């Protein structure tokens, strides 16, 4: 979800 952590899902 984040630029530094693209693996996090965007809710």
Curated annotation (Swiss-Prot):
Q: Domain of life of the organism in this record? A: Eukaryota
Q: Which GO terms describe its cellular component?
A: plasma membrane; side of membrane
Primary localisation category: membrane
Subcellular location(s) of the protein: Cell membrane
Mention one GO molecular function: metal ion binding
Give the required cofactors. Cu cation
Keywords from the UniProt entry:
Cell membrane, Copper, Glycoprotein, GPI-anchor, Lipoprotein, Membrane, Metal-binding
Q: How does it sit in the membrane?
A: Lipid-anchor; GPI-anchor
By sequence similarity, the record places it as follows:
Belongs to the multicopper oxidase family.
Protein name listed in UniProt: Monocopper oxidase-like protein 1
Protein source organism: Zinnia elegans
Upper taxonomic lineage: Eukaryota, Viridiplantae, Streptophyta, Embryophyta, Tracheophyta
């Amino acid at each position: 979800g984040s630029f530094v952590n693209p693996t996090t899902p965007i809710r």
